[in-house]
């Protein structure tokens, strides 16, 4: 049922959901682990991305977006988030968004990746009304995340890699030197910024999660978002009672979309 809550109480039950607590064996130090705390059934049709707002969430689907309350009941929709002008340019996909201040930022993607042009749209985070669209020079655009302190935005040129693109939002999205990562992360679907890190969700074979240090680019494996065989999607990183990481994962049967809440220890 939509908005229903399932809680993982023990490590054994976490394994039932194909969510384990993972450790890195290459170092004597204990690495962070993402562990599932609870899980909800997400709103149908909104599987691409998620961002936190004051009284709930914003979810994106391929060509739609909606704001929900804490129980994931839809309270506001934008069924045409891609403006006609950009549809005519081939843009047909909304990715994983982010909220900074009073605005929602969402990547708009067109599928002819070798053109090397994508776009970032800005919306009123409360009403979901479009404010403007900015073109960016990158091949793919599965996510955008904006650091609210610096107003530097992060994305990736391709659907995975070993660097995060950076833009100065205050200077009309002027490109900045990329943040080099110390490992390649494939199939990145979503990202969000919290606690001095960029947190990544992927749709690799295990739907793995990663943390990238904003200062050093050190990239740490955190574990799986679960539902292996399904597709990992967007992520939000906000400290709540339910956890720090909030991740969308499409069920292996394609329905429902799971909204998992993870602590990182």
Residue ranges and their predicted role:
Residues 38-63, 93-96:
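Beta-strand-rich domains and repeat architectures in extracellular enzymes and scaffolds
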Residues 44-46, 91-93, 116, 138-142, ...:
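Beta-rich catalytic cores
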Residues 57-83, 115:
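Beta-propeller domains
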Residues 64-69, 113-121, 161-167, 206-212, ...:
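Structural motif
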Residues 74-110:
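Blade-loop segments of beta-propeller domains
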Residues 187, 218-239:
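Conserved blade-ending motifs and adjacent loop-strand segments that build the rim/top face
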